[in-house]
UniProtKB/Swiss-Prot annotation:
Protein species of origin: Arabidopsis thaliana
Task of the protein: May act as a substrate-specific adapter of an E3 ubiquitin-protein ligase complex (CUL3-RBX1-BTB) which mediates the ubiquitination and subsequent proteasomal degradation of target proteins.
Entry remark concerning the domains of this protein: The BTB/POZ domain mediates the interaction with some component of ubiquitin ligase complexes.
Coiled coil: 421-492
Name the UniProt record assigns to this protein: BTB/POZ domain-containing protein At3g22104
Pathway membership: Protein modification; protein ubiquitination
Stretches the record annotates as Disordered: 485-506
Pfam families: NPH3
Family to which the UniProt record says this protein belongs: Belongs to the NPH3 family.
Boundaries of every NPH3 domain copy: 187-435
Organism domain of life: Eukaryota
Amino acid sequence: MEACCSDLEVDINGEQTIFLNKQIICAYSGTLRKLLGKSTSSSGNLKVIFNDFPGGAESFEFVSRFCYNDGRVAVMPSNVVFLHCAAKFMEVTKVLEQTEKCMEEIRYWAWPEVLLCLKQCQEVETSPEVDSLAAKLMDALVEKLCLTIEMSPSSAGSACSPDSSLFRFSCDSKSTESFKNCSVRLTWWFDEVLVLSSGLVEMFLKLMVLRKFDNLIISRFLFYYQKVKFCSASSHEKRKILETIIDTLCVLDRSCVPCKSLFAVLRLALGLNINKSCMNKLEVMIGHQLDQATLDNLLVPSPSKSSHLYYVNLVLRFTKAFLDGARSGLQLKKVSSLIDQYIAEVAPDPCLKPSKFLSLITLVPDSARESHEDIYRAIDMYLEAHTGTTDGEKLNLIRTLSYEKLSGESRAHISRNQKFQAIETLDEQQQQQQQQQQQKQLILRMEKVETSGENEKLKEHIEGIQWRVMELERACLKMQNQMEVIKKRSKSSSKGSNRSLPKLCS
């Protein structure tokens, strides 16, 4: 283009300066027409600076070529994102019409074309328009992936699982090779998706779950995603990645999420201070699979602010989450045994308070423990390491033991154990106090019974007196009536007689 015709200078995000003809570019761009106004016909060069142009200089050049080519441009998957965003910014309606028409065919694009467009979306500054375009592209990408997996000869993810019958019962080299090929067919897309930003990966995962994609494959991808991305991510990015992983794992089938992997995520999460909501979800997931955990899994170091050697509160929360769910007797016994091992491990911790130690002992129901041997040894170790424990605190710990669940050797050891002598004396005193209190209550109850009996007799006596009074009143009334009759008869028969009968009743 001739230099004399280039009367408009455009600075694109400080990356590049492009010289254009004002009349040509303004004929198509509504944005530049508004900016330049009447100056389009004036003499002299003008300069426009764009600091937030979507897609940068490359995107601007796409639109410029359209303007200089009499409104013609080849819109294709490789340039549609930049063209669409630039046309939206520059208000070039003719380009927008062509890009929107092109995007109507997204579902027919090849996988690499859709993935390329998504990569271009993350290069453009975020806006509602870009987000909407990315959502359409991501929906198409997930749809293609689902169709590809369904059409695969080994589409069922469980068939390639190490826990499946295919893997369990076929250990020869041929079947192992078959398993590897199956795994590759189902996970080929892992590295390709990892080129996307964490925000787009999160969108991808939500759509995968929504479409009920194989949970085992999603789980494998999540742990692979964490492993690869953590190598170069900042602390903030790591936190974001972990939160996305946890939010996705908690909606997957529990059987598809290995317990060991959850503990690996936990150790990372504790070091990154992820948000409380995600941490709670992770703790509940681990709690639901606590019967599959090992002692090493539970021996998590205490946070730096705490003086404890191990994170006891964390184990308390795990166990609570386990007990809140419906569990079989076998699972409960496994967890009970695991907690007893943990108690023995943390008992020597000099900073572990008696109340916290007692909480651990009483954490699982007593019915889950067939023996109290491990608990007794743990209590003995605890009292050995905590010489300042009061007799009352010791008594609370000893009372958790069921002597029926102790061996004869342990019972004999208790009777000889110097640490328990003061406890026995205190226990006897408390039993005496309880007996005295029970005797007082018995006396009070007896006194109440005696008082109640006397009151009953008095009541009967009063009722008898009232009955006799009523009988006398009726007899008196009857006699008065009879006297009235006698008086009337005596007046009529003996007229001259002044003698009256004595008054019997008034």
